[in-house]
UniProtKB/Swiss-Prot annotation:
Species for this entry: Arabidopsis thaliana (Mouse-ear cress)
Record-given protein name: Replication protein A 14 kDa subunit A
Function, in words: As part of the replication protein A (RPA/RP-A), a single-stranded DNA-binding heterotrimeric complex, may play an essential role in DNA replication, recombination and repair. Binds and stabilizes single-stranded DNA intermediates, preventing complementary DNA reannealing and recruiting different proteins involved in DNA metabolism.
GO process terms (BP): DNA recombination; DNA repair; DNA replication
The keyword Nucleus is annotated on this UniProt entry: yes
Major place of residence: nucleus
Record-linked CDD domains: RPA3 (cd04479)
GO cellular component, one term: nuclear lumen
Subunit and partners: Component of the heterotrimeric canonical replication protein A complex (RPA).
Amino acid sequence: MDTSSPSAFVNGALLRRFIGQKVRTVIQVTGSEIGSVVGKSTDDLQIVVRGSSPPSPLTTYLEVIGIAESDNAIRAETWTNFGNTFDTQNYNELCKLANGEFKHLFI
């Protein structure tokens, strides 16, 4: 595993704590336009993702790794389709643990 450029696990609410830093999140795609994808975070907040071209075709759930530009926008470096079913509650809890009590276990 490459640890030279770690990314924080975030949901929509946590994104604002990492502006200017590398993050990773999973969104439920709700729309796409040329140059951007709009999605719902695992805690039901809207996130706009811009940057490199997303995979085609898009699945319902998408992992994005990139730089947090604002409290609701990410500039994507890597996109990964996560399929059409995904346990958003578990991922949301992972984000809370990775930024809270068990932060020391995550890069």
